[in-house]
Amino acid sequence: KYYVMALGTGLSLTPIYNELQKRCEAKQLSFRNVVAFNAYEYYPIAKESSLKSINQLKERFLDHIDIDPQNIFTLDGSVAQDAVQDTCRLYEQRIKTFGGLDVTILGIGRMGNIAANEPGSSIQSLTRIILIGNMSREEMENSFKTKEQVPPCSLTMGVGTLLTAKTVFLTAWGDEKSEIMQKVIEGNITDTLPATFLQTHPNAQVVLDLSAAAHLTRIEHPW
């Protein structure tokens, strides 16, 4: 049986991917039996574009481990608009074909978004097209030269899809994520902060540094 992973591309995941790569190189870990699904892709984006999120994922991680390239799957951001719905439906089917997700590994956006699930996303949401919000567009400037070059939409695995994994990891580092992480972990579950839906998962694990955890009650008020 394959081990099936849904993988985000956020910069916060770089240390995680680096550690997994090191363990693979040291023969402590193998990805030969792994199937990887890219969590989201920009839309529309040219098939040959170097800025596709799958290319970022390959450069940061997948090209440096022993995974079979045929076991890497991504949403196609170059399909015609009338093919988007079928593309998303087939992605869901493919995940099921491999027996469902074993693990989801994600970063978090400043609006509490996971993958490209913007505020307002439902806990039942499946893979679909979604409009990229202004805050997310600013965050994506790291990948594109200007905010204007960021495509208007993403094809993303839904919150419901991501949470079908047996284990979900969410990572965040630094002061700029401390307020949002307090809301995600200690606040009410709400679709205005999609990451709060992780509170409903039986095996969700949040990995923070001390700066990102600064506003959590046990850190801010240990007494």
Language-model features, listed with the residues they occupy:
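Glycine-rich N-terminal segment of FAD-binding domains in flavoprotein oxidoreductases
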Residues: K1-A26
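Glycine-rich beta-strand-to-loop/alpha-helix junction loops that act as flexible
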Residues: L7-S12, L106-R110, W173
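A glycine- and small-aliphatic-rich helix-loop capping segment at beta-alpha/alpha-beta transitions
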Residues: N18-S30, S53-N55, E59, P119-I129, ...
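Solvent-exposed alpha-helices and their adjacent loops that cap or buttress functional pockets
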Residues: Q28-S30, I65-D66, I95-G99, I123, ...
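Ligand-binding beta-strand-loop-alpha-helix segment within the catalytic cores
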Residues: Q28-V103
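Glycine-rich phosphate-binding loop
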Residues: G99-S125
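Class I SAM-dependent methyltransferase SAM-binding "motif I" and its flanking Rossmann-like core
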Residues: A115-V159
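ATP/nucleoside-binding phosphotransfer catalytic cores, i.e., glycine-rich phosphate-binding loops
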Residues: M157-G160, T164-W223
